[in-house]
Amino acid sequence: MIEQMGDIWSYDGVSVIVLTTNGSLTRAGKAVPGNGVTRQAVDRHPWISEKLGQLIRLHGNHVFDLGDSLATFPVEDTAWSQPDLRIIARSAEELRSLADTSGWQKILVPRPGCGGGGLRWQDVRPLLEPWFDNRFTVIHQI
């Protein structure tokens, strides 16, 4: 796992960008984006909320390949709950499996649960280390 500071969107189109997500849906069945990278992604790609909503409705709150070099990484059950270290650990394993089966070579992940979620990086980092090899860059937004 590589760690660096920077703007995750400077890698758009070059790497798979991972969006931290939750399992909440609107009445219309669209995913509820949190703040940060996921909100920015929905602003750039409005189709994300509908597609992710369909996937959550069909398969639950899991890691998904959204296409267009975007993937999801659940960190909490709902948009109103706190990030859960157990969900983050499960998502790390699922993302590694998806990266392996998809042949992804460069994956950018924001620090899960550490921005608006309030978790400390020193508590989250050990959950990612067993799963994230040198294809994974965890980026701390500047």
Each language-model region and where it sits:
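Macrodomain-like recognition of ADP-ribose-binding/processing modules
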Residues: M1-I142
